C-alpha cells in the first residue's frame, strides 16, 4: 500500500521568505526566546498571550496608543480585557496607504466594473465621514446597510468606523422581514441601501422592500446607485436621499479619525437566525483589527500590493474579514452576483485578469466547479495565485484533490473554520506546514484550540467538541440587547466552565491538523454513536448523480435513525440501483454505521443566505415542530418539501 503523501509542501525558499517565518524570528529577538519550530512558537503564543498580542501590535505597526498593559484578568474568559488602556481607530489603520495604486477593484457579474485608487478611496471616505457627522452620527450610533459587495460599501463602512459609529450589514437579497429581524433590533441612526442589484444576469428590483424597511426603521435612508435609478427611488422613500445628494455639500479633505478604546464596538454581526430571531453579536475595533492582521499577514502571508479576493456577500462575516486586508496594504478584489454568470469560469477569468494572490471561496463553490467540469488549471493563467482558502462548510477530501488536479497543482490550499461568533478563524492555513488531504492545517496563533470529549477531557484520535480554553481578542464584546449577558454565556459557556465551546464536532489528526465533521447540534446519534453529517456528505456529494445532500437524525422506535435527503442532478431519478450505490459508497467510504436507514429525493434543499444548509430546520419540520424564523432562509419554501413525508412513517 502506497504511503500517504501531502498534497503540498512549502519549499525552503517559501518558508524562509514568508511573513510568518519573519515574525517568528522577530519575536525571538524581541523577547529573547528561541523557537525550535512552529509548534513551539504556537505554544508560546498561547502561554504568553500578553507578549504575543503586543508583538502583533508592534510588528504590524498598529496606529494608536497601546498603553502599558496587554492583558488583564486573562484567566477568566468572560472578564479578560486586552489592551485596556489602548486608543485606536479601525478605519485609520485600514486607510494608512495613499497614492494612485488600486485599493478596490470591482466586478458586478458582467454588468459593472470599476476600481478606486487609494487616493480616491480616501477622498470618498472623507466626504462620507463629514456627511455622517453632519447627520449627528458619532461614537456608538449604528449605521445599517443593505448593500452589494461593492466599493461604496467598503467606503461607507470605513467612514462609519472613522467616527466611532457601529457598522452592520446584510445583502440585498434578504427579504423585508429578514432585514427587519436584524436591523430592527439595533435601531440604526442611518439606513443605507442600493437601488437594485444584479444576479444571474438579471436586474433584481428592491424598490418596494426599501420603502417598507425604511418606513419601519424610521431612519434617514441613503440610496446608492448600482442597478436601478436612485434619483427616481429617493423621493418615494421616507427620509430618502441619494448618495450624491448626501455628500454634495462636502469636499474631500484631510481624514479625521476618532480614537477610542480597544474594546469599542465596531461591528454588529448576526447569527443565521434559523432557530429564532438572529443574535446580534458585537465585535470590537481592536480585537477585530489584531486578529485580522495576524491572519492576513502571517497565516495568509499577505504583502503590501498583493491582490486579495473572497467570494462573499455583505451578509457573511467573510466580507468583514476581506475588508481588513486593506490594513496590510492589499488590494481588495470585490465581486457581487452569481459565481456562475455567465458561466463557471467567471471568477477564474477575474483571478487571471487581476492576478489574485489569494482566492477565497466556499467548499460548496469548489464542489460545484468540479461537478460542472471546469478545469482552470488547463484554461487559465493562475501563475500569481499562491493561496486558495475554503470555508462555509467542511471541504471534502475529494474537494482537496480537485483543487490540486483541476485548479492549480502548486497552490497552498487552506481550509479555514471559525465564524461570525469570533469574526475570524479558530483553525486555518499555515505557510510553514504541509497540506494534507481533508485536513485543516492547524490552530491560529494565540488561540488555545483543543478537542474535548463530553467529560471535558482533551482527546486525540477521536471526535469531540472544538473548544478554546483561553481568552482571545476577537471574542464578542457582548450581544446587543443582552444586558445581563445571559444569552452570551448560554451561547458559548454553558457546556464547559470558563471554556469557549464553539459547537463544531472536530478531531485532531496525526499531522497536528484538524478535521471538522459538522456542527455538534446537527450530529447524528444512531445507537448512541456520534456521527458528523460532513462524514456522509463527503461520500455522497462526490457522486455526479447527487447535486446536494442533507442529513438528519429522525427519532424512531426509542432510537435515532439516519435519514438522507438528496437533490439529484438534472434528469437523474432515485432508482433502487442508485439507492444501493449511494449506500455502498457511504459504507465503503465511511462505515456501516453511517449508512442511512432512508434515502429520499427532494426537489430542493433549504439554505441560509450565505449558502449553508439548515439541518436543524429540516429536522424540526420532519418532527412536526415549527420553524421559528423562515425569513432567515434564502429559499424557505423548500421546507414544505419535508413535511408529512410518507416515507418517514414506516
Swiss-Prot record:
It comes from the Bacteria. Its EC number is 6.2.1.16. Pfam families: AMP-binding (PF00501), AMP-binding_C (PF13193). The modification N6-acetyllysine is found at residue 612. GO terms for biological process: lipid metabolic process. GO terms for molecular function: acetoacetate-CoA ligase activity; ATP binding; metal ion binding. CoA binds at residues 199-202, 587. CDD domains: AACS. ATP binds at residues 392-394, 504, 519, 530. Belongs to the ATP-dependent AMP-binding enzyme family. Catalyzes the conversion of acetoacetate into acetoacetyl-CoA. Is involved in poly-3-hydroxybutyrate (PHB) degradation, which allows growth of R.meliloti on PHB cycle intermediates. This is Acetoacetyl-coenzyme A synthetase.
Amino acid at each position: 500500500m502506497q504511503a500517504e503523501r501531502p498534497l503540498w509542501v512549502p519549499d525552503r525558499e517559501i518558508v524562509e521568505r514568508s511573513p510568518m517565518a519573519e515574525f517568528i524570528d522577530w519575536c525571538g529577538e524581541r523577547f529573547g526566546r528561541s523557537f525550535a519550530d512552529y509548534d513551539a512558537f504556537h505554544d508560546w503564543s498561547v502561554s504568553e498571550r500578553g507578549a504575543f498580542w503586543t508583538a502583533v501590535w508592534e510588528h504590524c505597526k498598529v496606529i494608536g496608543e497601546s498603553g502599558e498593559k496587554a492583558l488583564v484578568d486573562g484567566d477568566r474568559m468572560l472578564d479578560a480585557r486586552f489592551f485596556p488602556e489602548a486608543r485606536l481607530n479601525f478605519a485609520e489603520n485600514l486607510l494608512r496607504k495613499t497614492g494612485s495604486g488600486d485599493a478596490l477593484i470591482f466586478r458586478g457579474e458582467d454588468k459593472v466594473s470599476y476600481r478606486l485608487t487609494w487616493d480616491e478611496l480616501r477622498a470618498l471616505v472623507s466626504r462620507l465621514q463629514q456627511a455622517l457627522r453632519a447627520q449627528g452620527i458619532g461614537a456608538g450610533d449604528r449605521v445599517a446597510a443593505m448593500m452589494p459587495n461593492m466599493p461604496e460599501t467598503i467606503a461607507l463602512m470605513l467612514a462609519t468606523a472613522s467616527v466611532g459609529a457601529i457598522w452592520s450589514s446584510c445583502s440585498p437579497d434578504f427579504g423585508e422581514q429578514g432585514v427587519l429581524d436584524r436591523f430592527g433590533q439595533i435601531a440604526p441612526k442611518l439606513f443605507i441601501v442600493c437601488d437594485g442589484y444584479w444576479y444571474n444576469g438579471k436586474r433584481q428590483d428592491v424598490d418596494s422592500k426599501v420603502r417598507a424597511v425604511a418606513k419601519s426603521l424610521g431612519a434617514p435612508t441613503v440610496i446608492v446607485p448600482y442597478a436601478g435609478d436612485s434619483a427616481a427611488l429617493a423621493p418615494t422613500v421616507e427620509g430618502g436621499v441619494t448618495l450624491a445628494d448626501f455628500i454634495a455639500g462636502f469636499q474631500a479633505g484631510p481624514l479625521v479619525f476618532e480614537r477610542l478604546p480597544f474594546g469599542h464596538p465596531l461591528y454588529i454581526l448576526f447569527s443565521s437566525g434559523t432557530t429564532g430571531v438572529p443574535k446580534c453579536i458585537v465585535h470590537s475595533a481592536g480585537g477585530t483589527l489584531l486578529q485580522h492582521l495576524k491572519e492576513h499577514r502571517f497565516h495568509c502571508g499577505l504583502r503590501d500590493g498583493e491582490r486579495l479576493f473572497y467570494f462573499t456577500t455583505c451578509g457573511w462575516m467573510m466580507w468583514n474579514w476581506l475588508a481588513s486586508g486593506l490594513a496590510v496594504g492589499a488590494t481588495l478584489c470585490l465581486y457581487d452576483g452569481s459565481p456562475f454568470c455567465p458561466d463557471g469560469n467567471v471568477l477564474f477569468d477575474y483571478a487571471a485578469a487581476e492576478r489574485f494572490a489569494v482566492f477565497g471561496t466556499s467548499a460548496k463553490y469548489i464542489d460545484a466547479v468540479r461537478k460542472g467540469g471546469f478545469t482552470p488549471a488547463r484554461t487559465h493563467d493562475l501563475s500569481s495565485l499562491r493561496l486558495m482558502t475554503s470555508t462555509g462548510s467542511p471541504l471534502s477530501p475529494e474537494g482537496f484533490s480537485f483543487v490540486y488536479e483541476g485548479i492549480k497543482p502548486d497552490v497552498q490550499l487552506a481550509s479555514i473554520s471559525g465564524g461570525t461568533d469570533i469574526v475570524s478563524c479558530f483553525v486555518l492555513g499555515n505557510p510553514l506546514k504541509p497540506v494534507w488531504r481533508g485536513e485543516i492545517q492547524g490552530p491560529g496563533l494565540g488561540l488555545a484550540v483543543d478537542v474535548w470529549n463530553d467529560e471535558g477531557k482533551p482527546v486525540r484520535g477521536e471526535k469531540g467538541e472544538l473548544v478554546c480554553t483561553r481568552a482571545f481578542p476577537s471574542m464578542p464584546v457582548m450581544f446587543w440587547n443582552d444586558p445581563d449577558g445571559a444569552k452570551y454565556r448560554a451561547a458559548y459557556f454553558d457546556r464547559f466552565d470558563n471554556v469557549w465551546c464553539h459547537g463544531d464536532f472536530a478531531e485532531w489528526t496525526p499531522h497536528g491538523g484538524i478535521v471538522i465533521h459538522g456542527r455538534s447540534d446537527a450530529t447524528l446519534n444512531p445507537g448512541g454513536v456520534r456521527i458528523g453529517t460532513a462524514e456522509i456528505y463527503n461520500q455522497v456529494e462526490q457522486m455526479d448523480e447527487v447535486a446536494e445532500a442533507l442529513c438528519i437524525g429522525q427519532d424512531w422506535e426509542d432510537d435515532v435513525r439516519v435519514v438522507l435527503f438528496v437533490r439529484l442532478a438534472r434528469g437523474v431519478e432515485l432508482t433502487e440501483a442508485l439507492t444501493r450505490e449511494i449506500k455502498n459508497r457511504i459504507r465503503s467510504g465511511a462505515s456501516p454505521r453511517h449508512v442511512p436507514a432512508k434515502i429520499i429525493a427532494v426537489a430542493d434543499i433549504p439554505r441560509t443566505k450565505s449558502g449553508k444548509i439548515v439541518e436543524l430546520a429540516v429536522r424540526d419540520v420532519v418532527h412536526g415542530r415549527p420553524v421559528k424564523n423562515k425569513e432567515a432562509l434564502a429559499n424557505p419554501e423548500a421546507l414544505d418539501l419535508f413535511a408529512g413525508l410518507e416515507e418517514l412513517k414506516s
